[in-house]
Regions:
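Structured catalytic/nucleic-acid-binding cores of DNA maintenance enzymes
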Residues: 1-264
Length: 264
C-alpha cells in the first residue's frame, strides 16, 4: 500500500523521466482508472502538453502541465509508475499510458484498480477537493511538536487510528503507523488519552525519523529488517530486537502488528 515514502519514490521516478517531454498521445486501456474524466477528455487535455513539475501531497501526486492544469494521481493499494523507452517491454496491468515524442512512455499500472487519475483545469491545489481537505505534511518544518501534541490530545481514539486520519496528519497509513508506534515503544491500540507527555514526544520524534529514513531509502526497506518492523509484518514475523513473534490485532477494521514485549 503506497504511503508517503512510496509515493515520494514515485514522484522522483516521474520527475527524473517525464518532465519537459512533449506528450504525443495518451492511451487509457482501462477507463475505470479515471475520475471525473473520460479517455477522450484526458487525451484532449494532455496531447501536445508537457509535464513541468511534480509534487507530492500526502499519498497523491500533483503533476503540473504547461497548460495550467494538474494531473492528480492516487495510487490506491497497488498503483505504480513505470517509464520505458521505445522498444522496451510494456509492463503488465497498464491502465494509463502517456506516450512522449520519441516513443518513450510513462505507464500507470494498477492490478487491483483502487487508484484514480483525474485532470483538473487549475493551478491552485485548493481547487482540488481531495487536496484541500488534507492535514499538514508530517515532515514539514511547520508540523511542530506543538501541532502534533494538539492532534494527539484533541482526539480520543487509538494511537493507530489517529496517525492515519489524513485530515489531521497527511500521508501516514497502516504500515507506517505501526512502524512509528514500534520505534516509540508504544502499543498501537493504546488510547491517546493514556499517553504520557514523554510518550507523545517520543512518538513525534520517531515519526520524523521513520519517515525520513524511508524517504532516503526510496521506500526500499527490506535491507533494514534488523531495525524496522515493516519488513517483518505478516505471518510468523518477529520483532527485530527481541525476536518474539509479533502480535496481530484488528484496530477499527485495520490489521496492526506490534511487539508485545517492546511496546507498552
Amino acid at each position: 500500500l503506497p504511503e508517503l515514502p512510496e509515493v515520494e519514490a514515485r514522484r522522483r521516478c516521474l520527475a527524473a523521466n517525464a518532465l519537459g517531454r512533449k506528450i504525443d498521445r495518451v492511451s487509457v486501456p482501462d477507463k475505470r482508472i479515471l475520475d471525473k474524466a473520460t479517455p477522450a477528455a484526458l487525451s484532449r487535455g494532455l496531447k501536445g502538453a508537457s509535464f513541468t513539475d511534480v509534487e507530492r501531497r500526502a499519498k497523491y501526486l500533483l503533476v503540473r502541465t504547461d497548460r495550467n492544469s494538474i494531473l492528480l494521481i492516487h495510487f490506491g493499494l497497488t498503483g505504480a509508475l513505470f517509464f520505458r523507452e521505445r522498444g522496451e517491454r510494456k509492463p503488465r496491468f497498464s491502465k494509463a499510458e502517456f506516450y512522449f515524442e520519441g516513443g518513450s512512455c510513462l505507464h500507470y499500472t494498477d492490478p487491483r484498480l483502487f487508484g484514480k487519475i483525474a485532470l483538473y483545469e487549475t493551478t491552485d491545489d485548493d481547487d482540488i477537493p481531495e487536496i484541500a481537505k488534507l492535514g499538514p505534511e508530517p515532515l514539514s518544518r511547520a508540523f511542530t511538536f506543538k501541532r502534533f501534541n494538539d492532534v494527539i490530545r484533541g482526539h480520543k481514539t487509538t494511537l493507530h487510528q489517529v496517525l492515519m486520519v489524513q485530515e489531521l496528519i497527511a500521508g501516514i497509513g497502516n504500515e507506517y503507523s505501526d512502524e512509528i508506534a514500534y520505534q516509540a515503544g508504544v502499543r498501537p491500540d493504546r488510547m491517546t488519552t493514556s499517553l504520557s507527555d514523554g510518550e507523545v514526544r517520543r512518538l513525534y520524534d520517531k515519526m520524523k525519523w521513520v519517515l525520513k529514513q524511508a524517504v532516503n531509502l526510496n521506500a526500499e526497506l527490506d535491507g533494514w529488517a534488523d531495525r524496522l518492523i515493516i519488513p517483518n509484518r505478516g505471518k510468523d514475523g518477529e520483532c527485530p530486537r527481541t525476536h518474539d513473534k509479533l502480535s496481530k490485532k484488528t484496530i477499527a477494521g485495520r490489521t496492526s502488528y506490534f511487539c508485545p514485549t517492546c511496546q507498552k
